[in-house]
Design a protein with these regions (language model features):
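Acidic/glycine-enriched connector segments
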Residues: 2-5, 10-160, 167, 171, ...
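Non-Sec secretion/translocation targeting segments of pathogen effectors
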Residues: 182-188
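C-terminal amphipathic helix plus adjacent low-complexity
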Residues: 177-180
Length: 188
């Protein structure tokens, strides 16, 4: 199984949301499993891309029925809370709800057992900055040497697509022809 984290800002631009949905749909057909957090924006776009394919996603929630989503993955463990605390610069200032939001990021990167790293992270943050809740996950990914592709690093959607497809080809070298074929159909 190949797991990837699909995360990002609630304020992700519409054209990036469409790209996220298309990429998630493609990755689901390649038997990749999305790990995400059920938030509005990027998380929802990734989920929408693979929701019609059985067992194509693991949605980690900070609490039951977050955003009216049902998932067997809710209520972060004490271990996830401790791990999240390590990566947040002002943990003691967070509310209990904010701590749970940060803790669910650990699962997006390391799975339900907190021991099975995602192969890569696809995300969006404004200008590619390591900020907000997504920034917490990105700091963890960097520490765990998980490759990151941030769709916010470029303003031109065509450059984003080109770099994204190159990134995906690096992640799936054995499927380069299939990725290229999908890229060409996506661009038209």
């Amino acid at each position: 199984m190949i797991y990837y984290a699909g995360i990002g800002s609630r304020d992700t631009p519409a054209e990036i949301l469409i790209l996220m949905e298309n990429v998630a749909k493609y990755l689901a057909t390649q038997h990749c499993i999305l790990r995400s957090g059920g938030a509005n924006g990027a998380d929802t776009a990734f989920y929408n891309g693979c929701k019609n394919i059985k067992n194509a996603s693991e949605i980690y929630l900070p609490w039951k029925n977050f955003n009216n989503i049902e998932s067997k993955y809710s209520e972060p463990s004490e271990a996830a809370m401790k791990l999240a605390m390590k990566y947040h610069p002002a943990w003691e200032k967070l509310s209990q709800g904010a701590k749970k939001l940060q803790a669910r990021n650990c699962y997006q990167l390391l799975g339900n057992d907190l021991k099975t790293p995602s192969k890569f992270v696809l995300c969006y943050t404004k200008e590619g900055k390591v900020i907000g809740g997504t920034g917490q996950a990105l700091r963890m990914a960097i520490d765990y040497n998980i490759p990151i592709f941030n769709m916010g690093e470029e303003r031109d959607i065509n450059i984003v697509k080109s770099k994204l497809w190159s990134f995906l080809k690096e992640q799936f070298p054995q499927q380069t022809k299939k990725v290229v074929k999908t890229i060409e159909s996506e661009r038209s």
